[in-house]
Amino acid sequence: MDKPIDPFESINRHLAPSKKKSLLKKVLIGIVVILILLSIPYFWIQHLYPTTSPFKAISYLNYYRSRPHQDLNKSTMGFAPYWQLDKMQDIRLDLLTDVIYFSLTVDDQGNIAKKNAKSEDDPGWVAWNQAPTNDLIAKTQIAGGRAGLTIAILDNDKIKNFLLSDSSQTNLITSTVKEVNKKHLKLINLDFEYTGEPPEELAGKFTAFTNKMKQELSSKAPGTELDINLMVRSGRDPGLFEIEKLKSSVDRFIVMSYDYYTSGSDSAGPVAPMNGAASKKYFFDVTTTYSDLLKLLPADKIIMGIPYYGYDWPVEDKSDPRSLALPQSDANGYVETLSYGRAREDQKFSGDNCQFDELAQTPWCGYTEPTTGKDRVAWFENAQSIKAKYNYAKNQNFSGIAIWTLGYDKAYPDLWDILKQTFVK
């Protein structure tokens, strides 16, 4: 049997050992160069989108290439709370300028909380570091939007102790800048909710802290926007917020214009009535909130908070939209949050038992709950009420809107369609 022909045999016979080594070296160098060139896009993508793997990022890039970001005439923000992250699959990132994670809580020493009061893992911190959040951040950035983070202190004593400590403020500012740079964030939202009247010195302390936060962000994370949340009565009862002094360091003010009536209210009522305060039908309303704030702020500094939810109360009389609420108990039932999606899919929130309140620009329904036999009244948001709020924000020439919360509309496209009709150029 003939010996197989070696194609390199003649070359090997004529090459000296030194030349063989030189050729092998060149081949190896060539392979290394090719591998380096091939790896450059990998590491570049990893640099651009550090919260997810390059392979996922490439798949997101391919997906959003055919779904370009819409050209919007206003900012369209959406809050993504950690407890809603499994409901984000249907959000339209092409219609959102900003997605803001809610939230990392802070203790009175300025540390981002990793444990709660029961020494359990803090759910906000846990979710912040898990794949669903990291992937949402990358998707937002790839789709053409900005990813943001809410830093929250919701306890009066913690707010007081924090603001009275320079070292606590430094701790939080340092940690915030670290998170911004680590995840390529472009927006920090401060949510300091002090209830009641704070000690006189705290407002000045909050202003000074906000100034320091803005200075550090500008220095160490250039281009990062700093926003703060305001409450519905902040225009006339400023509490912690020296609004006119804050204008120089705060880019925009997100107004939480909802929860005018809550699960703890004595009676049923609209979560965000557009009107009704002047006639005393409602204790306060959205129009009055912004009328007050526009005396202190230019419209282009204001972001209008938009609720995608309402509440469903056990009440004394289902025929009265402002009926007194029954004490919450197993016998009477409990107040429930009623998201747009749930109201949309449940027939008892769309029948003859429902009416649209023209003053509040919000629907309500009265019905009897079969399991308890008790009357209930639900106030919630539907497409008509959301459209009224979007149009109000546009007509007032506000900087934009902020949805509370993303995912409350489930897979229904209605509100995305209205947002597109209202804010796409």
Where would I find each of the regions flagged by the language model?
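Solvent-exposed loop/turn segments at secondary-structure junctions
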Residues: 82-86, 104-108, 147, 153-158, ...
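N-terminal Lys/Arg-rich, disordered targeting/topogenic segments
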Residues: 1-26
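Conserved, mostly hydrophobic/aromatic
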Residues: 99, 190, 253, 304, ...
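Glycan-recognition patch characteristic of GH18 chitinases/ENGases
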Residues: 38-178, 416
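Substrate-binding surface in catalytic domains of secreted glycosidases
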Residues: 78, 112-128, 174, 195-343
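Surface-exposed amphipathic alpha-helices with a cationic face
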Residues: 65-70, 134-148, 152-153, 207-226, ...
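Aromatic-rich peripheral "rim/lid" segments of glycoside hydrolase catalytic domains that contact
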Residues: 111, 118, 406-425
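Glycan-binding loop/region signatures in secreted carbohydrate-active enzymes
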Residues: 48-66, 115, 306-392, 419-423
